[in-house]
């Protein structure tokens, strides 16, 4: 009987310290997780976040770390805008297959929305097959994408490439060992 009372006392005496914060101010890694994996916010058709806009932003549900309570919702969940890749239905695997097997006729470029280059490849038999080979490499590296500016449909946790670009306005932070 005494061990049962001791166990009940320990169970009810446990204190929880809930911290109420504005969850939109959380910025450090480990304070929250976006998107909340329990909500299933990945669109199965596009393999991107549901509601991804043309500007590359999506509002998703996030979850705060343990013992953090959001003042907006009264629980540990909140919404936040996160970056995403807007897709318009062009699949990378379809484009690669078209480029490998029908690239000499320009079908891959017609599929991506480049009819002029597709017609040029058709008339020159893929640029004497050299243009076809170059297109296969450029499409595999995701340098050539759909003409409407969208991203390829790639599995959400797939081998997507994020290209980091710089121009004359890019500032490179000098390192100590230079």
Swiss-Prot record:
Principal subcellular localisation of the protein: membrane
Family: Belongs to the TM2 family.
Domain TM2: 94-137
Alphabetical list of InterPro entries matching this protein: TM2, TM2D1-3-like
Extracellular side: 19-99, 146-178
Subcellular locations according to the entry: Membrane
The species this protein was found in: Drosophila melanogaster
Glycosylation sites: 69, 75, 168
Transmembrane spans: 100-120, 125-145
GO biological process: positive regulation of Notch signaling pathway
Gene (name only): bisc
Function of the molecule: Positive regulator of Notch signaling. Maternal neurogenic factor involved in Notch signaling-dependent neuroectodermal specification during early embryogenesis. Functions cooperatively with amx/TM2D3 and amrt/TM2D2.
Protein name, UniProt field: TM2 domain-containing protein biscotti
Superkingdom to which the source organism belongs: Eukaryota
Pfam families xref list: TM2
Protein's membrane topology: Multi-pass membrane protein
Signal peptide: 1-18
Observed phenotype of the null mutant: Viable but females are sterile. Reduced adult lifespan. No morphological defects of the eye, wing, notum or leg. Eggs produced by mutant mothers fail to hatch and embryos display neural hyperplasia.
Alphabetical keyword list: Glycoprotein, Membrane, Signal, Transmembrane, Transmembrane helix
Other notes: This protein is named 'biscotti' after the almond flavoured Italian biscuits because of phenotypic and molecular similarities with TM2 domain-containing protein almondex.
PANTHER family attached to this UniProt entry: BETA-AMYLOID BINDING PROTEIN-RELATED (PTHR21016), TM2 DOMAIN-CONTAINING PROTEIN 1 (PTHR21016:SF1)
Cytoplasmic side: 121-124
Record's GO cellular component terms: plasma membrane
């Amino acid at each position: 009987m005494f061990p049962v009372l001791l166990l009940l006392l320990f169970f009810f005496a446990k204190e929880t310290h809930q911290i109420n914060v504005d969850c939109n101010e959380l910025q450090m890694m480990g304070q929250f997780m976006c998107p909340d994996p329990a909500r299933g916010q990945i669109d199965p058709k596009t393999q991107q976040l549901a509601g991804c806009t043309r500007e590359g932003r999506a509002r998703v549900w996030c979850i705060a770390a343990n013992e953090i309570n959001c003042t907006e919702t009264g629980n540990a969940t909140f919404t936040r805008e996160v970056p995403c890749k807007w897709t318009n239905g062009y699949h990378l695997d379809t484009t690669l297959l078209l480029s490998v097997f029908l690239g000499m006729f320009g079908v891959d470029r017609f599929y991506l929305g480049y009819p002029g280059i597709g017609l040029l490849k058709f008339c020159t038999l893929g640029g004497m097959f050299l243009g076809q080979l170059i297109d296969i490499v450029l499409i595999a590296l995701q340098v050539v994408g759909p003409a409407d500016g969208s991203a390829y449909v790639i599995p959400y946790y797939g081998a997507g490439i994020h290209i980091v670009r710089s121009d004359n306005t890019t500032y490179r932070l000098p390192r100590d060992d230079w």
